[in-house]
Amino acid sequence: MMEEEELEFVEELEAVLQLTPEVQLAIEQVFPSQDPLDRADFNAVEYINTLFPTEQSLANIDEVVNKIRLKIRRLDDNIRTVVRGQTNVGQDGRQALEEAQKAIQQLFGKIKDIKDKAEKSEQMVKEITRDIKQLDHAKRHLTTSITTLNHLHMLAGGVDSLEAMTRRRQYGEVANLLQGVMNVLEHFHKYMGIPQIRQLSERVKAAQTELGQQILADFEEAFPSQGTKRPGGPSNVLRDACLVANILDPRIKQEIIKKFIKQHLSEYLVLFQENQDVAWLDKIDRRYAWIKRQLVDYEEKYGRMFPREWCMAERIAVEFCHVTRTELAKIMRTRAKEIEVKLLLFAIQRTTNFEGFLAKRFSGCTLTDGTLKKLESPPPSTNPFLEDEPTPEMEELATEKGDLDQPKKPKAPDNPFHGIVSKCFEPHLYVYIESQDKNLGELIDRFVADFKAQGPPKPNTDEGGAVLPSCADLFVYYKKCMVQCSQLSTGEPMIALTTIFQKYLREYAWKILSGNLPKTTTSSGGLTISSLLKEKEGSEVAKFTLEELCLICSILSTAEYCLATTQQLEEKLKEKVDVSLIERINLTGEMDTFSTVISSSIQLLVQDLDAACDPALTAMSKMQWQNVEHVGDQSPYVTSVILHIKQNVPIIRDNLASTRKYFTQFCIKFANSFIPKFITHLFKCKPISMVGAEQLLLDTHSLKMVLLDLPSIGSQVVRKAPASYTKIVVKGMTRAEMILKVVMAPHEPLVVFVDNYIKLLTDCNTETFQKILDMKGLKRSEQSSMLELLRQRLPAPPSGAESSGSLSLMAPTPEQESSRIRKLEKLIKKRL
């Protein structure tokens, strides 16, 4: 019974002592302990096992028990001490609270005493300073009254003097007096309710109005709208009148400026009327010469009359530009058919020179916001084409590949007058664009004629495989056009010029590059695509001559240069054109065209070497391999293949020295074409004896070594072949070697032969297996059981369609080739 009660007590105690993880974590942080007994996950069994790890340790059990009892006794003592200490805690707390409350009450009493004393002190200070404050207010009011009376006296006297001086046109004295009167009047704004003050204010406004009308009348008299200018220099009266106008309503100043400029340019409107000979573009110099003379005349006669901050000379020049732009636009619309490109460029050049003259002479401070927005200069460009204006001498000295790669010059400062007149020519720049279209068309025709007359680059010279000189000439001309057009406009005309550039880049690619690629022909006539793919039995394969190989390489190098330069051209055009039009600059199509030329050139080189090797592969498949009695040196067909490789590859490599990556592409494409074709012809070697298979294996190894050495064959400098190329050759030719090793293996026992086939050929399938059985000369009846065994032992492919697809791509069958040939022939006939 006692034991049950003890168990219940222990369970209740454990339930009470079961703490939440948060509480347990807080206890561990406040009272860190390394004692296992303090851990929340304490396990009594593990603790006992730690104390007594072995049976021998049980000998010390009494000592351990005594230590634990001693520890329990100490804990009990500590607990009793703590419990006793908590007996009087409640009473002590109540006593401390009462003491705190008493202290707070005493503090409140002291604060109240301090507040009462402060209020008494404040009242005492107010009583002492009451009389002093009244005296201070009286002094302030008296000072204000005296100041106001003085201002009133000054205002009344100033108004009287202002009216008298206005009548006598004493503008020099009026300028100083008026400003003072205006300043004094500002002090009386809050007194405008007083009739006398309001009356003085109205007299000042009336005097200002009278002054404005009087000054305008004086200027009208001195510079009448009709008739000639007043002889002699300006009077001091008008100079002082301008100082007064600076103080008056800004509209007075604007009216004076407007009338003076209008009178100053009246002669210009008469001299250069639309019906006058000097108004046309061929005499545009006279317009600018006239305004330059007028500016000199203004500085001599009227430079001191107007205040410097009015910038009258610049205002005259700006108004002249606006009038000239309007007049030129009007006359060009009327006589649009008479505008020729030389005349247009002449007028634009003279106009831009004049705008540059204005930028050097004036700051552009008088240009209004609207004018600046309308005539906003194009964004600064870092295009190296802007370093100077090209001349014929410079074009002759221009390097072939340096035109678009010159270092950038520092950005030139903006011209605030750019386009202020030349903007009127932009609607007529189509004449310039059409002229460039015609010139580029003639340039392309000249390139075609020169190529026919001079022929392709000669082999065994520095020219072999070099970039065609016509390519550099084309981009030099493009540079000239770009610089010229960017000086004329950076808006829509630049987009139109870009379209012209695109047109003739495509024409150059078609007429000069693609159009001059050699055609593959035979002695009997044209060579069709099928004849390139089919085997040549008894017919001589037409190879490209040395000159033709050099020409193909030269066209490839030229296309590569055009591709890189066109990409740079696109970047420079985007730098030149307005920001809003950048999205419309896109030469991707032209770059793709040059990429197509490069691919076509490489394909021609591959087809030529591939076709040259076809007769040798055909000879290999026609040999009687079952009659070979001993293994000797490499077979004649291997020697023939190696001979063709040694003839073509060094020529191609030397001519593509400047475009190494495309030579690597040629090697890769040839390997991808030759190796599957070699394996296809290998399957045609049937039946084959053991010795014949050994000879074929030797030949295959020889071809493998030659192909691995193909990038540097015949070269004095031995370079390691690119890893991508080596991987293709090793993978393809190793497959051919594995096929021959399977052929050489005995076909009995069947299980061993099938397992050996699966092991050696990772891309094994029943189709390849049957071809190997045909090479061994086995009968169909023998093959059926072996094929069935193979199907049973073949692992299931992850995707049958993908597996078979990849195998068919790697080793196309003759049936697949003939089917492909027929489709291509039908497509060609349909196109023709």
From Swiss-Prot:
Annotated membrane topology is: Peripheral membrane protein
| Superkingdom assignment | Eukaryota
- Biased composition regions of type Acidic residues, renumbered to the chain: 386-397
Alphabetical list of PANTHER family matching this protein: VACUOLAR PROTEIN SORTING-ASSOCIATED PROTEIN 53 HOMOLOG, VACUOLAR SORTING PROTEIN 53
Protein family per UniProt: Belongs to the VPS53 family.
Q: Where in the cell is it found?
A: Golgi apparatus, trans-Golgi network membrane; Endosome membrane; Recycling endosome
Region named Disordered: 373-412, 794-822
InterPro entries noted in UniProt? Vps53, Vps53_C, Vps53_C_sf, Vps53_N
In its UniProt entry, the species of origin is given as: Pongo abelii
Compositionally biased residues, Basic and acidic residues: 398-412
Q: Where is the composition biased (Low complexity)?
A: 799-809
- State the Gene Ontology BP annotations: endocytic recycling; protein targeting to lysosome; retrograde transport, endosome to Golgi; vesicle-mediated cholesterol transport
Lineage of producing organism: Eukaryota, Metazoa, Chordata, Craniata, Vertebrata
Full protein name:
Vacuolar protein sorting-associated protein 53 homolog
N6-acetyllysine PTM positions read 110, 360
What would be one Pfam family of this protein?
VPS53_C
What gene is it encoded by? VPS53
Keyword terms: Acetylation, Coiled coil, Endosome, Golgi apparatus, Membrane, Phosphoprotein, Protein transport, Transport
Q: Name one GO cellular component term.
A: recycling endosome
On this chain, the residues bearing Phosphothreonine are 391
Assembly information from the UniProt record: Component of the Golgi-associated retrograde protein (GARP) complex, also called VFT (VPS fifty-three) complex, composed of VPS51, VPS52, VPS53 and VPS54. Component of the endosome-associated retrograde protein (EARP) complex, composed of VPS51, VPS52, VPS53 and VPS50/Syndetin. EIPR1 interacts with both EARP and GARP complexes and mediates the recruitment of the GARP complex to the trans-Golgi network. Interacts with VPS50 in an EIPR1-independent manner.
Question: Which purpose does this protein serve, as stated in its record?
Answer: Acts as a component of the GARP complex that is involved in retrograde transport from early and late endosomes to the trans-Golgi network (TGN). The GARP complex is required for the maintenance of the cycling of mannose 6-phosphate receptors between the TGN and endosomes, this cycling is necessary for proper lysosomal sorting of acid hydrolases such as CTSD. Acts as a component of the EARP complex that is involved in endocytic recycling. The EARP complex associates with Rab4-positive endosomes and promotes recycling of internalized transferrin receptor (TFRC) to the plasma membrane.
| Stretches assigned to coiled coil | 97-138
Q: Which residues carry this modification: Phosphoserine?
A: 377, 580
